[in-house]
């Protein structure tokens, strides 16, 4: 049985919590809640979390599906160096970003989700995981001569000679009448109206 890669789960949880923070911040700011400035903070924090978490890290074993447009943000995260690779840093950052958003009811759900993502990142860091970017692999082109080992030795199955139609037989009319022509109705039709 394989080992669970916790960073993958933390990444999905943090990305979802960033989106939830943005949505709650929009509700709080547009609704002019009494502490609406926490809503604007939640929007900024949610956008930051989404930008940080959008690029997926590559898995230790197997292949990883890259998100659409991820390579551009991956280049930015590579520039941050060890700050973007270290999951201890991400856990602390997410925990610190979640505290001010917890003072407003509209953003409390995003706060709880971000705290859960922080805990999962801490678990991933304790287990020794770190973020590694998905590197594009060069596509291997199959060589035409290399894919075919031997041509087939048996011909494909064909119907018996008697069952095969010859080109001239299609024009000839069989005894029962042409297949595409008019047909004779076996039931007599009368045109009497009562």
UniProtKB/Swiss-Prot annotation:
Protein name: Cytochrome b-245 light chain
Region (Disordered): 134-194
Intramembrane extents: 70-80
Recorded GO CC terms: NADPH oxidase complex; plasma membrane
Source organism of the structure: Oryctolagus cuniculus (Rabbit)
UniProt keyword Electron transport, yes or no: yes
Domain of life, per lineage: Eukaryota
Post-translational modifications: Phosphorylation at Thr-147 enhances NADPH oxidase activity by promoting NCF1/p47-phox binding. Ubiquitinated at Lys-149 likely by RNF145.
Any GO BP: innate immune response
Lineage: Eukaryota, Metazoa, Chordata, Craniata, Vertebrata
């Amino acid at each position: 049985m394989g080992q669970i890669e916790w960073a993958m789960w933390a990444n999905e949880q943090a990305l979802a919590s960033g989106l939830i923070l943005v949505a709650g911040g929009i509700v709080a700011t547009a609704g002019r809640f009494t502490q609406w400035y926490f809503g604007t903070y939640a929007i900024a924090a949610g956008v930051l979390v989404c930008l940080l978490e959008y690029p997926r890290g590559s898995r230790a074993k197997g292949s990883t599906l890259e998100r659409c447009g991820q390579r551009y943000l991956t280049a930015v995260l590579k520039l941050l160096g060890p700050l973007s690779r270290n999951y201890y840093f991400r856990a602390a950052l997410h925990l610190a970003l979640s505290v001010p958003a917890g003072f407003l009811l509209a953003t409390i759900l995003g706060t709880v989700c971000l705290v859960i993502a922080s805990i999962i990142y801490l678990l991933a860091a304790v287990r020794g995981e770190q973020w590694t970017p998905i590197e594009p692999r060069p596509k291997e082109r199959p060589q035409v001569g290399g894919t075919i080992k031997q041509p087939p030795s048996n011909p494909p199955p064909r119907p018996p000679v008697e069952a095969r139609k010859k080109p001239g037989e299609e024009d000839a009319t069989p005894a029962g009448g042409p297949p595409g022509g008019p047909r004779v109705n076996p039931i007599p039709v009368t045109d009497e109206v009562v």
